């Protein structure tokens, strides 16, 4: 994958960032499934910061979220259990992910493990268990293979941002705190 430098963004830039041909999907998920996904996402995250400011241990499977905020406590060893193929099985022990909040009507409220939420992502993670995300594979899908992930971002930039990505997108939004 590539990164996008400051300046004009082209369709080729977007395709180089999202080159895999994944499709947007949306499903219903319980708060417990979301908590498991977050825990799986941060299993290898360590406190030591790399030169680019990201925590050591992040991978392509590290979830970038919207509508959620949470803290990763790197002093806690991962208790994520995976099978011999690297697929998520369970969390057996204390969780590294703490203080998970869901945005609802412009307010933040603690996630409810029993509640049902709507999750949007690409089919690779949600349906195909990519990067080991097994928790959503059998869920009920609201939207299935809507459009290519790079096309979703192109549409958002063109149709909702008027083709201008503002300064607010250049800095972290504070949704993920690493301690």
Residue ranges of model-derived segments:
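Catalytic centers of hydrolytic enzymes
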Residues: 1-179
